[in-house]
């Protein structure tokens, strides 16, 4: 990054640790180590990691026009479907004074998530099935924000069950259309999902194409 580049801070997001420079998104980090081969750069004497939109859906949503990113620096975040830690590492960056609980059911990606947590003191991995929030609720004091990225047919019900258990104020849901039903029209599946989520205060629905086909990122207040 040249010294002449001036970062354009994303519009009125609550969290100032996210910046966008032209078609790239970055998170300010206290842990300047690559997690998945991303670029690390210095801007105004601060260290940033590039947030790859082809590897992480919130970055894709930002580039596709997401206006509100409701995660604050001291929030407690419950992340369902944490996988190997690509996206949750950026959530860890933007919540340096917060706590991030990452739930992952598969052992192989969980082992990588566990390695990541050894380098980040605000990240707590949980090896459990998000279908059963009662199995890990004892570990979690409170939740401000819930983020879900799970490829299961009942992904909406998983989201609602965890909202009922943890009562977060705000939520992100990655809707994976083809995981719900592979043969039905995408618009029909999206409309059904919107009906199921109408009990919440829906804020934004962002199509993630071309970064992810038949994927949407939905933000809401509960």
Swiss-Prot record:
Report the EC code(s) recorded for this entry.
2.1.1.-
Gene Ontology molecular function terms on file:
histone H2AQ104 methyltransferase activity; RNA binding; rRNA methyltransferase activity
Sorted alphabetically, the keyword list is:
Methyltransferase, RNA-binding, rRNA processing, Transferase, tRNA processing
Biological processes annotated in GO? box C/D sno(s)RNA 3'-end processing; tRNA processing
Q: How is this protein organized at the quaternary level?
A: Interacts with nop5. Component of box C/D small ribonucleoprotein (sRNP) particles that contain rpl7ae, FlpA and nop5, plus a guide RNA.
Tell me where on the tree of life, at the top rank, the source sits.
Archaea
Q: Which family does it belong to?
A: Belongs to the methyltransferase superfamily. Fibrillarin family.
- InterPro entries given for it? Fibrillarin, SAM-dependent_MTases_sf
Q: What is this protein called?
A: Fibrillarin-like rRNA/tRNA 2'-O-methyltransferase
Function field: Involved in pre-rRNA and tRNA processing. Utilizes the methyl donor S-adenosyl-L-methionine to catalyze the site-specific 2'-hydroxyl methylation of ribose moieties in rRNA and tRNA. Site specificity is provided by a guide RNA that base pairs with the substrate. Methylation occurs at a characteristic distance from the sequence involved in base pairing with the guide RNA.
**Listed Pfam families:** Fibrillarin (PF01269)
Q: Which SUPFAM superfamilies match?
A: S-adenosyl-L-methionine-dependent methyltransferases
**Positions with a binding annotation for S-adenosyl-L-methionine:** 86-87, 104-105, 129-130, 149-152
Q: Does the keyword RNA-binding apply?
A: yes
Please state the gene responsible for encoding this protein: flpA
Question: By its UniProt entry, which NCBIfam families does this protein fall under?
Answer: PRK04266.1-2
Please name the taxonomic classification of the source: Archaea, Methanobacteriati, Thermoplasmatota, Thermoplasmata, Thermoplasmatales
